Amino acid sequence: SRKEVKVLIKKGQIKVNEEVIKSDKFQVKEFDDQITYLDEPLVYQKDFYYVLNKPAGVISATQDNYEQTVMDLLSDEDYREDLFPVGRLDKDTEGLLILTNDGKLAHRLLSPKKHVEKEYFAKVKGVMTEEDIDSFARGLVIDKGEQTLPAQLFIDSIDHEEETSAIRLILHEGKFHQVKRMVQAVGKEVTYLKRLRMGGFLLP
């Protein structure tokens, strides 16, 4: 933090181009100057990336006057004002959310032209079937006549007594409430939803 750096400078532990820095007002050229702490070089980091396992009840926003946001989950040490979530998860949805200040990465992950895979785990009220797998593979017409791209549905388990299912779903787009709406289109209801993967980013 800035406060900690000031303390280190006062202790004479920071050097720029092998000269001990005496003032925290010293101007540094991040790409030209060599900065060391206890004679160990420090490397300037421009872009930051955090893979967050978002809990339910937290909103995918940078700030809100009433709700807890994903930015509130960061420690003071990790918090940066230029961070933002890549896309969003519903308030009641858990799982993978990337926080970054890298706009190019965000564009690559969110661009509809890229068809980046997003994998979800869901608990469903209702028994999913082989017919549902085929329907998802063809693409579904969800409410308001909106057509989805083909999606891969995997049925992990079925409880016939409780009439519930556990599924995984791989999407190649990101429509509003898409998983819930696709499951609803085949007559079932999502009761729990967690994102496991976005492109090459996986939950730890």
What are these regions (language model features)?
Residues 2-204:
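Basic, flexible Lys/Arg- and Gly-enriched helix-loop patches that mediate nucleic-acid binding at interfaces
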